[in-house]
C-alpha cells in the first residue's frame, strides 16, 4: 500500500468480524453504553488515534501477531508529528554512547524530576526513562536520521545535566516518514487494518463494565460498533478544545493554540464518561514567546522571540500594567512562571532607536535587519512613536506607568545600581526616540492533563481500580505525568513512542488470555 493511500484514503478494515450492526441514528450517543456483545469474535487490539503513540502501538501489536485495527478521525496519519519539533530524549542510546557522553536513565529520571518540580508521576517517569534508549535505538534502526549534533542541550527549556535530547534532521517529520513506512509493511502483511475519517464516539462495555470496543462514525455519518478484546486510546490532548480549556484552565484560554485542530480531547472525554480518573487537568503551560501581528491579534502570529543563551535582549519587557515583571535573561522555568502570572498572558518588548541600531542579533527569531526595518515602517508588528507616552497610548497601556518604568530602569543603569530583577547583561539606557514595541503572547502546543493509568498503562478509575480492557498512551495521558509542573526537553514525543510500544505488548498479551462468559 502506498503512503499516500494511508494519508488520504479511508482503508477498509477487517469486515464483519470487527463490525457491529449499522445504527440508524446519525447523532453521537451521549450516555455510557453497556452491551452483551462478545469480544471473542472481534479484533485483538483496537487503537484509537493514529499519531505519535498510536502508530508505534499498531506496529508493535502487529509484530506480536495480533489482529490489529488502527482508526483516526483525520484523513491522514501522524497527528502532531506533522508539525512538532519532534524532540526526544533518553540516556545511553547508541548515538549518545558513540559520543562517549556518560549518562544513565537514573540521571535522566532525576533531571526530569528536578525540572518538573518533583510533581511528576514517579512510576510513569521511571518507565519512560528506563525504556527511552531502546526507543531511540529502534527509531535509528528503522531509518530515522538525527542531526549530527544530537544529542544536545535544548535552550528553550531548563537544561539536563548532560546532552540527551535528539532532534530529527527534518524535525518530527524525520520520525513520521520511517514510521509510516513501517506501518505500510504491516498493512501489506495483512494483520493490521486502518480506517481513517473514522471518529470514535463512545467506549463500549459489557455487563461487567469491561471495555469491549468503540462506537464510531464515518465521514458519511454512519454509526457502527467496532468490537475488540482490548482498546488503546492514543487520541492526543485537548489543546484545540476551548470549552475544555475554559473548564479546566480558564487562565490560559487567551493563549494561542498552535497545534492541529483535531486535538479536542476525544479520548479523555470518552474515558471520563465510563469513570476513568483524570489527572493534572488544572495544569496547562502556555509558552511565552509568540510574536503577534498587533493589527491581527489574537489570530495573526508572526514568529517567536529568541531567548538566552542564543540571544540576550537589550530591550525590556513590560506587561499590560506597563510594569517590568521578570529578568529578561532568566532561566526558562523562571520566565514561564513569571509569564503565567501576567494579565491575558501578554507583554510588550520595548526598545528605542539606540537599541534598534546596536542590535547584533534581533529579538525576533529568523528576522533580518531588512525585515525589521520593513516591519517598523508597516506598523503591523512593531509599533513606533516619538515618545514613550505616545507609544503607551498606541499600545493601550498606562502612559505614565511606562514612563516611570523606563525611568527607573535607566536610573539604575546610570547610577550603577543593581537591576531590580537581577539582570546583568546588555543593560542599555532606553531614551532615544523613536521608541518601539511589539506584542508577545502565549502559545499552547500540548496539554498537561489527561487520563490516569497504572504502570502497565491500564486506565484506572477514581478508586484506582483498573477499567478492564482499556489502555492509554501518549498525550491523552497528559504531559504532566512525566513533566510535573515544568517543561522537560524531549519528554512528550519520546515517551509517547515508548509507551505506544509498551502498551501494545501488554494489550496483546491480555487479549490472548481473555475469555468472556457473556454471550451475544
How should each PLM-predicted stretch be described?
Residues 39-51:
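Beta1/beta-strand and adjacent pyrophosphate-binding region of the FAD-binding site
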Residues 130-222, 242-243, 291-293, 413-432:
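Conserved redox-cofactor binding core of oxidoreductases
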Residues 401-484:
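A glycine-rich dinucleotide-binding beta-alpha-beta segment and adjacent secondary-structure elements
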Residues 268-270, 274-394:
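An anion/pyrophosphate-binding glycine-rich loop and adjacent beta-alpha core
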Residues 1-14:
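N-terminal secretory signal peptides and thylakoid transit peptides that target proteins
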Residues 64-81:
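Glycine-rich FAD pyrophosphate-binding loop
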Residues 226-294, 493, 502:
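Glycine-rich loop(s) and the adjacent beta-strand/alpha-helix scaffold that form part
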Residues 41-43, 221-230:
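Core beta-strand elements of the Rossmann-like FAD/NAD(P) dinucleotide-binding domain
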Amino acid at each position: 500500500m502506498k503512503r499516500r493511500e494511508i494519508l488520504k484514503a479511508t482503508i477498509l478494515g477487517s469486515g464483519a468480524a470487527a463490525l457491529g450492526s449499522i445504527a440508524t441514528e446519525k447523532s453521537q450517543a451521549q450516555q455510557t453504553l453497556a452491551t452483551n456483545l462478545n469480544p471473542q469474535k472481534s479484533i485483538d487490539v483496537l487503537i484509537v488515534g493514529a499519531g505519535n503513540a498510536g502508530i508505534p502501538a499498531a506496529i508493535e501489536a502487529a509484530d506480536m501477531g495480533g489482529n490489529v485495527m488502527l482508526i483516526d478521525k483525520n484523513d491522514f496519519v501522524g497527528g502532531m508529528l506533522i508539525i512538532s519539533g519532534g524532540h526526544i530524549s533518553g540516556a545511553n542510546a547508541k548515538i549518545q554512547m558513540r559520543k562517549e557522553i556518560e549518562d544513565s536513565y537514573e540521571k535522566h529520571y532525576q533531571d526530569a524530576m528536578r525540572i518538573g518540580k518533583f510533581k511528576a508521576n514517579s512510576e510513569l517517569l521511571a518507565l519512560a526513562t528506563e525504556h527511552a534508549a531502546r526507543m531511540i535505538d529502534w527509531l535509528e534502526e528503522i531509518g530515522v536520521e538525527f542531526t549530527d549534533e544530537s544529542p544536545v542541550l535544548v535552550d528553550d527549556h531548563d537544561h539536563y545535566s548532560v546532552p540527551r535530547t535528539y532532534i530529527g534532521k527534518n524535525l518530527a517529520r524525520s520520525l513520521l516518514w520511517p514510521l509510516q513506512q513501517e506501518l505500510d509493511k504491516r498493512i501489506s502483511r495483512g494483520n493490521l487494518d486502518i480506517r481513517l475519517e473514522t471518529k470514535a464516539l463512545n467506549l463500549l462495555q459489557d455487563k461487567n463494565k469491561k471495555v469491549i470496543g468503540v462506537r464510531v462514525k464515518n465521514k458519511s455519518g454512519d454509526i457502527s460498533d467496532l468490537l475488540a478484546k482490548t482498546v488503546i486510546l492514543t487520541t492526543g490532548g485537548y489543546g484545540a478544545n476551548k470549552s475544555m480549556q475554559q473548564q479546566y484552565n480558564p487562565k490560559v484560554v487567551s493563549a494561542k493554540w498552535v497545534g492541529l485542530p483535531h486535538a479536542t480531547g476525544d479520548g479523555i472525554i470518552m474515558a471520563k464518561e465510563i469513570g476513568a480518573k483524570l489527572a493534572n487537568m488544572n495544569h496547562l503551560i502556555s509558552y511565552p514567546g509568540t510574536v503577534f501581528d498587533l493589527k491581527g491579534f489574537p489570530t495573526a502570529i508572526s514568529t517567536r522571540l529568541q531567548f538566552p543563551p542564543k540571544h540576550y535582549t537589550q530591550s525590556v519587557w513590560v506587561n499590560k500594567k506597563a510594569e517590568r515583571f521578570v529578568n529578561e535573561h532568566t532561566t526558562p522555568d523562571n520566565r514561564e512562571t513569571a509569564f503565567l502570572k501576567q494579565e491575558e498572558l501578554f507583554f510588550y518588548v520595548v526598545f528605542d532607536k539606540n537599541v534598534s541600531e546596536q542590535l547584533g542579533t534581533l529579538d525576533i527569531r529568523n528576522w533580518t535587519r531588512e525585515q525589521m526595518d520593513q516591519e517598523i515602517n508597516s506598523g503591523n508588528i512593531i509599533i513606533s512613536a516619538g515618545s514613550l507616552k505616545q507609544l503607551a497610548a498606541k499600545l493601550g497601556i498606562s502612559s505614565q506607568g511606562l514612563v516611570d518604568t523606563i525611568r527607573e530602569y535607566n536610573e539604575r543603569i546610570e547610577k550603577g545600581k543593581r537591576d531590580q530583577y537581577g539582570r546583568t547583561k546588555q543593560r542599555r539606557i532606553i531614551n532615544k526616540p523613536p521608541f518601539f514595541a511589539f506584542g508577545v503572547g502565549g502559545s499552547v502546543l500540548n496539554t498537561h492533563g489527561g487520563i490516569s493509568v497504572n504502570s502497565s498503562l491500564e486506565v484506572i478509575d477514581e478508586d484506582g481500580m483498573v477499567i478492564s480492557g482499556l489502555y492509554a498512551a501518549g498525550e491523552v495521558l497528559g504531559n504532566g505525568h512525566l513533566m510535573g509542573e515544568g517543561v522537560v526537553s524531549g519528554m512528550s514525543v519520546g515517551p509517547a513512542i515508548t509507551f505506544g510500544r509498551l502498551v501494545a505488548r501488554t494489550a496483546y498479551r491480555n487479549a490472548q488470555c481473555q475469555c468472556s462468559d457473556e454471550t451475544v
